[in-house]
Amino acid sequence: MGTPNDQAVLQAILNPNTPFGDVVGLDLEETEEGDEDGVFPQAQLEQSKALELQGVRAAEAGDLHTALERFGKAISLLPERASAYNNRAQARRLQGDVAGALEDLERAVTLSGGRGRAARQSFVQRGLLARFQGRDDDARRDFEQAARLGSSFARRQLVLLNPYAALCNRMLADMMGQLSAPSNGR
């Protein structure tokens, strides 16, 4: 199987268009969840998760009004749980309420203590909003936090925000393309 470093080198050789070190499967080392759901009463937690799932399904179906209503109920049920704020932020962003989305993301990061799945997703969402607003330094900070929590998407965004790394990846991709292309006339 090889060491993680060996896997990263092979990944760079075989898939030069992906950021160096972005190895499929290595993200599994992160501690899953870590959102401390165990501190909530089980019955309320199950009800809150069911409401969130209904909200996610409604948002995926384009029914943002219902999604926001379900996320709001989940928040009312367990106001100290970060996940519903993160999900509501996504629905608010889709609705065009960037300020509301940012408020929810701030709350999710605070409640999660910057740890676990909800924090990782919140940092990614907040980083994307900052990037769309042209606040690249803020985006970079959020993507760095998300990457530390195991987000391969955040690592790719960091590469895109780093012009030198992007140039190196492009040059490597070009060289690999030239090496693998059949020669004309040979």
Curated annotation (Swiss-Prot):
Q: What keywords sit in the KW lines?
A: Phosphoprotein, Repeat, TPR repeat
Give a single Pfam family match: TPR_8
TPR repeat spans: 48-81, 83-115, 120-153
Q: Which InterPro entries match?
A: TPR-like_helical_dom_sf, TPR_rpt, TTC36
Recorded hits in Gene3D superfamilies, A to Z, give: Tetratricopeptide repeat domain
| SMART domains for this protein | TPR
Question: A GO biological process this protein is involved in?
Answer: negative regulation of protein polyubiquitination
User: What family is this?
Assistant: Belongs to the TTC36 family.
Entries under PANTHER family matching the protein: CDNA SEQUENCE BC021608, TETRATRICOPEPTIDE REPEAT PROTEIN 36
Its recorded name reads Tetratricopeptide repeat protein 36
- Tell me what organism the protein belongs to: Rattus norvegicus
